[in-house]
UniProtKB/Swiss-Prot annotation:
Compartments where located: Cytoplasm
Gene that specifies this protein: udk
GO aspect biological process, one term: UMP salvage
Main location per the UniProt record: cytoplasm
Stated name of the protein: Uridine kinase
Annotated pathway: Pyrimidine metabolism; CTP biosynthesis via salvage pathway; CTP from cytidine: step 1/3; Pyrimidine metabolism; UMP biosynthesis via salvage pathway; UMP from uridine: step 1/1
Keyword Metal-binding: no
Claim: rRNA processing is one of the keywords in the record: no
Length: 213
């Protein structure tokens, strides 16, 4: 973990797809933002760092294993975390779940006192772990994650149920068992029951609030 004297504090939230990571991250961001203001806290999703695949056909894009660490541009994410800690702004990539690739536009992110980083594969990369001041693993049963993923991907990402189930069986579950679950050992805090664990959220809020003092 990094020294807490750095200008920008990085908090990592990892766990299975649809485990409740984004809900915890958004809840912490919303409630802490009310206390300290937009200028002091931000959220960066690991999904923004899926590699640019604009050169591939849609058939090839659909076949990509998006749950393998090689699908992520962790080198760029690592560079961006270092830049934020130096006090420099970054250009955050924009990823389209419909087009299955990175968009041309970017979003400028200014340095903040606290950056909440959330994604499935964050703890699999030693470089990213070293940049985090502390890390969280959201530990939710896989059957619950699957039900949430079906609902999310069909309703929000334009997927069919058959395609969601096929992807889950072919890559999502195997990659969770191979990469994501073993990375739980690197987490400082393990949160059971997903994003609606109010007690865990309050404990995390208290911990993060220390960085604003």
């Amino acid at each position: 973990m990094t020294d807490q004297s750095h200008q920008c504090v990085i908090i990592g939230i990892a766990g299975a797809s649809a485990s409740g990571k984004s809900l915890i991250a958004s809840t912490l961001y919303r409630e802490l933002r009310e206390q300290v203001g937009d200028e002091h806290i931000g959220v960066i999703p690991e999904d923004s760092y899926y590699k640019d695949q604009s050169h591939l056909s849609m058939e090839e894009l659909v076949k990509t294993n998006y749950d393998h660490p090689n699908a992520m541009d962790h080198s760029l994410l690592f560079q961006h975390l270092q830049a934020l800690k130096r006090g420099s702004a970054i250009e955050l990539p924009v990823y389209s779940y419909v087009e299955h690739t990175r968009m041309q536009e970017t979003v400028r992110v200014e340095p903040k006192k606290v950056i909440i980083l959330e994604g499935i594969l964050l703890l699999t990369d030693a470089r990213l772990r070293e940049e985090m001041n502390f890390s969280i693993f959201v530990d939710t049963p896989l059957d619950i994650c699957l039900m949430r993923r079906i609902k999310r991907d069909v309703n929000e990402r334009g997927r069919s149920m058959d395609s969601v189930m096929a992807q889950y069986q072919k890559t999502v579950r195997p990659m969770f068992l191979q990469f994501i679950e073993p990375s739980k050992q690197y987490a400082d805090i393990i949160v059971p029951r997903g994003g609606k664990n109010r007690i865990a959220i309050d404990i995390l809020k208290a911990k993060i609030s220390q960085f604003f003092e």
